[in-house]
Amino acid sequence: MATIRPFMGIRPAPEYAKDVAALPYDVMNTEEAREMVKGNPYSFLHINRAEIDLPVGTDPYSPAVYEKARDTFYEQLDKGIFTQDLLPNLYIYRLSMDGRSQTGLVVCTAIDEYLNDTIKKHELTRADKEADRIRHVDTLNANTGPIFLAYKENADAEAIIDGYTAAVPPVYDFVSEDGIGHTVWVIDSDTEIGMLVQSFANVENFYIADGHHRNASAVKVGLKRREQKP
């Protein structure tokens, strides 16, 4: 059985959300990332591609880059650019473009379900890319890149999501510079959280649609944490 869990998310304050939103870290090179953040000190690329705030020519895999990412992340948290929810929540995230949309849940999944193949993989991973994300996640003590998981049709979950999005206003609703609409709801009701968690009781597997390196890296950091705090 595939399981989901709520968590205390760290997320942008609503007034900063549009500025924080950024493309994935691995779809551009360093110079392109530098260009993208001009005039925007809040872009998440300052955290996910922190070499852009260090001297030109800095090795993007040097310890200084991960330390800079950590410092920027916690500085923005201290300044209120990001806030952390005080209780564990689930989140609904909708992406829209050209009249079409896809809606998903933002949740925690289990390391053990990755290890026992409840979470299915279909790609091999590269050691160098894993090492980069391991250092990033470990240094920041945060998972900064979501993994895109798919699952077979779940009518119960779909009904709960549809009902919630129809009844509750979103916390974010904006269009980013690339023309994609981002709409997010926070599910902070214990009733709906419990119903959604239970709705996955008959879901046998998750399938990694995107994020094999991020998932493998997060698992390895998680295993390291278990060793440190058995």
Model regions and ranges:
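A cross-family signal for N-terminal binding/gating loops and helix N-caps
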Residues: M1-P230
